[in-house]
């Protein structure tokens, strides 16, 4: 009887390497596949693609599996990077890793793996898949400190039915132990951080290669000009560092934070104090939705939600549709609202709002707007909250 073939996405890191080894030990016919998703800067100081490939080959030789490289750079630029730039240009803060998983790692990669006669694919993500009554559920990892279901919430039934996450039941510390015990050449390699195509380079420097600077006023809620920004695309909601007001002693003397953007007037609004009302939200509206089960939860469903990675689940109530002026959007586009029990800090348009029912990831959507702690205010795409005197 032939062994079941599993194609493993190998990045050169410890997690995907241990994933391949575990599956080989379990008797699967394992094939490693290295994805190259970015063409530029291959010889630059910030690009590790060449070394990553060397590490993949070394690991494959050690554990005794075949490995090949596949180039998805064109698909990545078309499906992920173009959207990344569009979102930043519109003043939002996107999460390209979420889109990369849905469009590249579990679509282009999955399609290629099937062409290699694979029955399943596997990655080193920390998450779990469970089949129940013919449906597939996406679950949090056993090690909640490493859980990556937030980034995987756009996966659908077809993708999950073909996916394995061997590390979902294993603590990260155990993964490191396994790597050392079997002598993996990359056992002590640091975990990768940041957006894959940016690497370790300064984010603002990278973004400036693709988006022009467009200076404008930096104002407080009462309309006072306190500085000049270099372009709204270069700032994100809740940002503290890099604003350029560190030495300013005006106002309360507390740290400054980015609180809103007004695209029409090219104005960046800043406030002082971590818990300023403009940084706190009890409600949000999200669009571009995706549900793991293929359908949304029931209207009024009480659940938990994350509005950023590694955030604790925040208790909230799900609404099938937003109400009021914020409900306006592209015709036919599904949207939802969340009403939180407690105010959430720096809910950022462009990021993902991901819903959970305990351990089960239900799916989510892209945050479009978030009502702040003051009546009549909202942080949304292209609009600043109402000025203080208008409250």
From Swiss-Prot:
GO cellular component terms attached to this protein's record: cytoplasm
The EC number(s) this enzyme carries: 2.8.1.13
Keywords: ATP-binding, Cytoplasm, Disulfide bond, Nucleotide-binding, RNA-binding, Transferase, tRNA processing, tRNA-binding
BP term (GO), one: tRNA wobble position uridine thiolation
InterPro entries assigned to the protein according to its UniProt record, in alphabetical order: MnmA-like, MnmA-like_C, MnmA-like_central, MnmA-like_central_sf, Rossmann-like_a/b/a_fold
Region Disordered: start-end pairs: 372-391
Biased composition (Polar residues): 372-382
Chief localisation class: cytoplasm
Gene Ontology terms for molecular function: ATP binding; tRNA binding; tRNA-uridine 2-sulfurtransferase activity
S-S bridge residues: 100-196
Gene3D superfamilies, sorted: Adenine nucleotide alpha hydrolases-like domains, HUPs, Translation factors
Location relative to the cell: Cytoplasm
Family: Belongs to the MnmA/TRMU family.
Name of the protein described by the UniProt record: tRNA-specific 2-thiouridylase MnmA
Species whose genome carries this gene: Burkholderia cenocepacia (strain ATCC BAA-245 / DSM 16553 / LMG 16656 / NCTC 13227 / J2315 / CF5610) (Burkholderia cepacia (strain J2315))
């Amino acid at each position: 009887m032939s062994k079941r073939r599993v194609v493993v996405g190998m990045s050169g890191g410890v997690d995907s390497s241990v994933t391949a080894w575990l599956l080989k030990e379990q008797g699967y016919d394992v094939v490693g596949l290295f994805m190259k998703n970015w063409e530029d800067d291959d010889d630059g100081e910030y690009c590790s693609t060449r070394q990553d490939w060397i590490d993949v080959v070394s690991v494959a030789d050690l554990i005794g599996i075949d490995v090949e490289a596949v180039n998805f750079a064109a698909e990545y630029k078309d499906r992920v990077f173009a959207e990344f730039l569009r979102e930043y240009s519109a003043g939002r803060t996107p999460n390209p890793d979420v889109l990369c998983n849905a469009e590249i790692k579990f679509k282009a990669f999955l399609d290629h793996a099937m062409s290699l006669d694979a029955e399943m694919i596997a990655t080193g993500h920390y998450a779990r898949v469970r089949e129940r009554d013919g449906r597939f559920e996406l679950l949090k990892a056993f090690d909640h400190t490493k859980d990556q279901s937030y980034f995987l919430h756009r996966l659908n039934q077809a993708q999950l039915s073909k996916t394995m996450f061997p590390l979902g039941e294993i603590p990260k510390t155990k993964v490191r132990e396994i790597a050392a015990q079997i002598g993996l050449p990359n056992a002590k390699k640091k975990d990768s951080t940041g957006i894959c195509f940016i690497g370790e380079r300064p984010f603002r420097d990278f973004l400036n290669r693709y988006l022009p600077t467009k200076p404008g006023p930096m104002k407080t809620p009462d309309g006072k000009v306190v500085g000049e920004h270099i372009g709204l695309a270069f700032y994100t909601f809740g940002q503290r560092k890099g604003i350029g007001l560190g030495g300013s002693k005006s106002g309360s003397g507390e740290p400054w934070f980015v609180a809103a953007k007004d695209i029409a007037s090219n104005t960046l609004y800043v406030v002082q104090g971590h818990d300023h009302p403009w940084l706190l939200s009890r409600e949000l509206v999200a669009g571009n939705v995706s549900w793991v089960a293929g359908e949304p939860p029931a209207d009024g469903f009480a659940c938990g939600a994350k509005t950023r990675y590694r955030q604790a689940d925040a208790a909230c109530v799900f609404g099938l549709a937003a109400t009021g002026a914020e409900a306006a959007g592209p015709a036919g586009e599904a949207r939802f609202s969340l009403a939180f029990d407690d105010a959430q800090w720096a809910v950022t348009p462009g990021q993902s709002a991901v819903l959970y029912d305990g351990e089960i990831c239900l799916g989510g959507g892209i945050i479009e707007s978030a009502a702040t702690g003051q009546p009549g205010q909202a942080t949304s795409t292209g609009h600043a909250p109402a000025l203080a005197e208008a409250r």
